[in-house]
């Protein structure tokens, strides 16, 4: 992939994936982010045995499982993949300082690397990224806030074609009173509108670290690694932002016909946490 192509594709994929992560669980606009001024504490990047390593103690995967044949380029896209939601919700606790509504207006790219060409770009580039995100779906008896993934897919319109991001996984890999780091994996498809032909498919793994700032805002560092359909890394990009708190968490008891309060209580009981049922 040429550097010029990398500069077009990576931001587009990042915007789609960030939009998916940002979708608010219950909002009409579907949410996630904002930034004011890029953080001065830039993401530090190095490589180790061919892997991109954030100086967070977290590494990107050296490989991912290949995309199934029916989702690879040349196949016809099945629109049924866009119907319905997650059959099984994955619940995880988040720090109380993360719970709430956050707004982002822009991000700054601080690093990108195309593995095939060897092209590396350490220049900073700020771009608009207007998003609002909700963190927090349910609260347990002790006041702890829990989240789950209600939005497993997102679609972005590009005129003659659209891109689809299908979430495979999202989970916190580290959570303390000072930071939380999420790992997310997506399958991304480019689909021609008229023919429904899949013209490209690839994978993306994102590592996102949130840290509370003294002024009440949120410092966010993001690393997005793109993999080809076979699961081999082809490029990586690092972004930073500051997200502004816009309000408290908007907890959700019901969503698209699902009783989330009951499902959360069942999750707690099934995991020997019945004492936390609200």
Where would I find each of the regions flagged by the language model?
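N-terminal chloroplast transit peptides
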Residues: 1-3, 21-28
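Bacterial N-terminal signal peptides that target proteins for export
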Residues: 2-13
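Amphipathic/hydrophobic helical signal segments and adjacent flexible N-terminal regions
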Residues: 26-101, 105-134, 236, 245-278
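Short, charged, low-hydrophobicity "junction" segments
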Residues: 72-81, 151-161, 189-196
């Amino acid at each position: 992939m040429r550097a010029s192509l990398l500069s077009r594709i990576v931001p587009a994929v990042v915007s789609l994936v960030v939009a998916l992560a940002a979708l608010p669980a219950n909002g009409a606009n579907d949410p996630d982010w904002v930034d004011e001024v890029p953080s001065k504490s830039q993401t530090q990047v190095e490589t180790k045995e061919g892997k991109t390593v954030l100086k967070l103690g977290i590494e990107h995967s050296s490989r991912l499982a290949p995309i199934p044949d029916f989702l690879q380029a040349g196949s016809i896209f099945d629109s049924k993949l866009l119907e319905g939601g997650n059959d099984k919700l994955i619940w995880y606790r988040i720090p109380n300082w993360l719970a709430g509504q956050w707004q982002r207006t822009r991000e700054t790219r601080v690093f990108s690397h195309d593995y095939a060409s060897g092209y590396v770009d350490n220049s900073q580039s700020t771009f608009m990224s207007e998003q609002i995100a909700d963190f927090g779906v349910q609260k347990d008896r002790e006041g702890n806030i829990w989240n789950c993934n209600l939005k497993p897919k997102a679609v972005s319109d590009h005129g003659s074609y659209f891109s689809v991001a299908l979430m495979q996984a999202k989970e916190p890999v580290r959570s303390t009173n000072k930071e939380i780091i999420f790992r997310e994996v997506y399958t991304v498809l480019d689909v021609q509108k008229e023919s429904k032909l899949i013209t490209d498919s690839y994978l993306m793994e994102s590592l996102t670290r949130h840290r509370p700032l003294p002024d009440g805002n949120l410092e966010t560092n993001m690393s997005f690694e793109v993999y080809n359909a076979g699961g081999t890394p082809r490029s990586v990009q690092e972004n930073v932002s500051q997200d502004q708190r816009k309000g408290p968490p908007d907890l959700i008891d019901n969503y698209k016909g699902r009783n989330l309060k009951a499902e959360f209580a069942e999750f707690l009981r099934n995991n020997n946490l019945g004492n936390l049922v609200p």
